[in-house]
A protein has these predicted regions:
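Short alpha-helical donor nucleotide-sugar binding micro-motif in glycosyltransferases
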Residues: 79, 144, 261-264, 271-276
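Short hydrophobic beta-strand element within catalytic cores of glycosyltransferases
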Residues: 301-304
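Conserved acidic donor-binding segment of nucleotide-sugar-dependent glycosyltransferases
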Residues: 316-317, 321-327, 336-342
Length: 384
């Protein structure tokens, strides 16, 4: 099968969407399929075979993210020459619209993965800040109506999306490459940041944006450290809130107990998961919470707010705890796991076992079956 992927975010930009595309593309190619990616260009990007880059501009609100200018005199000729079987778009914006136009022009099936609750990200779009969340949901629903299949990562997101579109919606979680977690250096994190063996490491990993609710985690940690001074909170990643979060940590008097690593290499990220004792996650907007799945693969129990996709990534009381958005409850669950080493070890074992259900290989096979069914429906509809 020959698959065209259109995305508004791709390497070297880092995000859950980019990681999802990387992992899925690798697995599809391992299964013998040909994958071609259409994405924005970034300064100093690495040229890759099968990746077509489009001129782009940095966004005013977050310069690290580039918005593609979806214009190319060669795009239709390129799509024709590639002889694609299906087009798969990963956002409803500039590259997503280009993918739709190409699918329409060449009569190809169009698949859309709904990675993000777009209504929760309006504050990043200066041209759309006045749009209400209801309007954004309707607009994204209208894009779904143009597609032949909409893929979502969890059942709770399916229920939300299905209310706003007539298109078939199917649940296929983003798979995680468990092989990455086989050979890890569990001591790397402590060596890198000079953390003693007695100190417990709390970890958060992700883009530091307002919607990730990292300020909540800092407020919680300020309570945790009162009882457990021999802990450290490591925050991996960068984003528009990086500086304000650093300032908040210092204002709260925990600046010396919180380590902001900035962006790390993939190997360093894996070793960070492997070297931590507990993963913390407070986002209210995740469609899946890919980092929660990665934490599982490292055998790392998590405490997370029970919201949207995160609620389906953690089995409450088995491989972690889900809480309400209440600081006292969240703090209580962290303290419970820090107090009880045996409970934490058992949850770590459970997390590792349950990670088998979200392997990237099995999810890629499920995606291929969805492609095949969509292509078949499209062909049948054409002859009716």
């Amino acid at each position: 099968m020959r698959i065209g992927i259109f995305t508004d975010s791709y390497k070297p930009y880092t995000s859950g969407v980019v990681r999802s595309i990387e992992t899925t593309t690798a697995e599809l190619r391992n299964l013998g399929h040909e994958v071609f990616i259409f994405a924005p260009s970034y300064p100093n990007y690495e040229k890759e075979e099968g990746v077509f880059r489009f001129a782009s501009l940095p966004t005013p609100t977050y310069p690290d993210f580039a918005v593609a200018l979806p214009f190319s005199v060669n795009i239709n000729a390129t799509v024709r020459e590639l002889d694609l079987d299906v087009i798969h778009v990963h956002s409803p914006f500039t590259m997503g619209m280009l993918g739709w136009r190409c699918a329409k022009r060449h009569n190809l099936p169009l698949v859309f993965t709904y990675h993000t609750m777009y209504d929760q990200y309006v504050h990043y779009m200066p041209f759309a800040r006045d749009l209400s969340r209801k309007v954004v949901l309707k607009l994204s629903g209208a894009f779904c109506d143009r597609c032949d299949l909409v893929i979502v990562p969890t059942g709770v997101i399916r229920d939300i999306v299905a209310k706003n579109t007539k298109t078939k919606v199917e649940v296929i979680p983003t798979g995680i490459d468990r092989k990455e977690f086989v050979s890890v250096d569990r001591g790397w994190l402590r060596r890198r940041y000079r953390i003693s063996d007695q100190c417990k490491i709390l970890l958060h990993l992700g883009r530091l944006g307002k919607e990730k609710n990292v300020a909540f985690l800092l407020q919680v940690y300020s309570e945790v450290v009162r009882k457990y001074s021999d802990t450290v909170f490591i925050i991996v990643g960068k984003g528009p809130e990086s500086e304000s979060l650093r300032e908040l940590a210092h204002t709260m008097g925990i600046g010396e107990k919180v380590i902001f690593t900035g962006p790390l290499s993939r190997e360093e990220v894996i070793n960070s998961y492997a070297g931590a004792d507990l993963f913390l996650f407070a986002s209210l907007t995740e469609t899946q919470g890919l980092v929660l799945g990665e934490a599982k693969c490292a055998g790392l129990p998590a405490v997370a707010i029970s919201a949207l996709g995160a609620a389906e990534m953690i089995n409450d009381g088995e491989d972690g705890f889900l809480t309400s958005p209440d600081k006292k409850e969240f703090t209580k669950r962290i303290l419970q796991l820090l107090d009880d080493d045996e409970l934490r070890r058992q949850m770590a074992k459970n997390a590792l076992l349950m990670s088998e259900k979200i392997s990237s290989e099995s999810m890629a096979k499920k995606l291929v079956r969805a492609y095949e069914a969509t292509i078949s429906r499209k062909r049948k509809a054409a002859v009716m």
